[in-house]
Regions:
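N-terminal extramembrane/targeting module of integral membrane proteins
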Residues: 1-48
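Polyanion-binding and phosphate-handling cores
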Residues: 11, 19, 79-100
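Local cysteine-cluster metal-coordination motifs and their immediate loop/turn environment
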Residues: 40-67, 89-104
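Short cysteine/histidine-rich zinc-coordinating motifs and their immediately flanking basic loops
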Residues: 46, 68-72, 109-114
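Rieske [2Fe-2S] iron-sulfur-binding domain
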Residues: 63, 68-89
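Juxtamembrane amphipathic/hinge helix adjacent to a transmembrane helix
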Residues: 101-124
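C-terminal single-pass membrane-anchor helix
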Residues: 122-154
Length: 154
């Protein structure tokens, strides 16, 4: 199909689903997929997600072909893909959040791709969390002693 100016519309091929859709240039990948009845979420994430705000990381897709035909990854998107809290993920360069992808030309997409846990990074995060938690608990115990001493209960 062509636009009013006679340009071809970008085609998004969904590898897993075996379907292709035409989208306007600059279209949001997540919105376009959902509008066409293509699910980008796994399991319970069909209900529990951030509705396309780029915060939860549940609409991951892998751009198999045409990764130059979409907008660049933002630092926030990279952070969400890597894993925000204790568990870190290995991020392939072509792994994206579909809600953050703007389609400029033809692409091939794999929905719900597998991803690996980054064991070393996860271990480092757990160590840091343990140290911070220990200091927080020590601070709270110290604060409790100060408060009890102040009110004369010790």
């Amino acid at each position: 199909m062509k636009t009013k100016k006679g340009e071809n519309l970008p085609v998004v091929k969904f590898e897993r689903e075996g379907r292709s859709i035409e989208v306007p240039k600059g279209a949001n990948l997540r919105k376009s997929a959902l509008k066409a009845g293509i699910n980008v979420y796994k399991g319970i994430n069909q209900i529990l997600n951030c509705q396309g705000h780029g915060l939860c990381g549940t609409c991951r897709v892998e751009i198999i072909q045409g990764d130059k035909n979409v907008n660049s990854k933002t630092p926030m998107e990279e952070w969400v893909l890597k894993g925000k809290f204790l568990i870190a993920h290995k991020v392939k360069p072509n792994l994206r959040l579909s809600c953050q992808v703007k389609v400029d030309d033809d692409i091939v997409v794999l929905t719900m791709p597998e991803y690996e846990i980054d064991k070393e990074e996860t271990i480092e995060r757990v160590k840091i969390f343990a140290v911070v938690t220990l200091f927080a608990l020590l601070f709270l115990v110290g604060l409790a002693f100060i408060v009890l001493d102040f009110i004369g209960k010790l």
